């Protein structure tokens, strides 16, 4: 399957702001895709200030299907980053991005500062949950990868 880097950035997305960073996510990001796997995208956007201060602020997470995407507004991204969310931490360490504004590199340069005890707890919790799924005969991936 050929990857279209900005295929997920469609009109139906209603992103009221500008894209800061995006990457392929899921099985394709780890080269574990199967022949029928779909391509997932994730990213970070910065909402327009007038929208943030308005009566109808934009969503903190935008999602969609065909193609599958999940994109966080930068405040939500930072909240998840400070909680040590593994998928969010991974964004700072990947070299496999498909869109990246220069401002992203400032955050990326500080990425080691976000590797805290909380991140270790999050990764260990995820690993334990995956082992429990295996013990109960459930797949570790819900769809799309090996």
Residue ranges and their predicted role:
Residues 1-26:
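Helical scaffold of the NTase/Pol beta-like nucleotidyltransferase catalytic core
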Residues 4, 9, 48-49, 85, ...:
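Alpha-helix initiation/capping motif
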Residues 2-8, 57-64, 75:
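A near-ubiquitous, low-amplitude feature marking generic local secondary-structure context
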Residues 30-62:
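Catalytic metal-binding acidic patch
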Residues 63-146:
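Conserved NTP/Mg2+-binding pocket subregion across the NTase superfamily
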Residues 27, 40-42, 96, 102:
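N-terminal, helix-rich and Lys/Arg-enriched segments in bacterial and organellar proteins
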Residues 22-24, 41, 77:
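Generic structural hydrophobic/aromatic packing signal, biased to beta-strands
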Residues 26-28, 50-53, 72-75:
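Flexible, active-site-adjacent loop/turn segments at secondary-structure boundaries
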């Amino acid at each position: 399957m050929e990857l279209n880097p900005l295929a997920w950035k469609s009109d139906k997305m209603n992103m009221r702001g500008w894209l800061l960073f995006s990457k392929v996510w899921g099985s394709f990001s780890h080269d574990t895709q199967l022949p029928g796997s779909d391509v997932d995208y994730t990213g970070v956007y910065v909402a327009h200030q007038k929208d943030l201060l308005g009566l109808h602020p934009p969503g903190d997470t935008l999602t969609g299907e065909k193609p599958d995407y999940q994109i966080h507004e930068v405040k939500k991204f930072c909240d998840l980053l400070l909680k040590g969310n593994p998928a969010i931490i991974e964004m700072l360490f990947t070299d496999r991005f498909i869109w990246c504004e220069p401002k992203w590199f400032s955050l990326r340069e500080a990425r080691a500062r976000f590797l805290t005890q909380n991140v270790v707890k999050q990764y260990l919790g995820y690993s334990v949950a995956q082992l429990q799924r295996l013990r109960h005969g459930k797949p570790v991936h819900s769809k799309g990868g090996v």
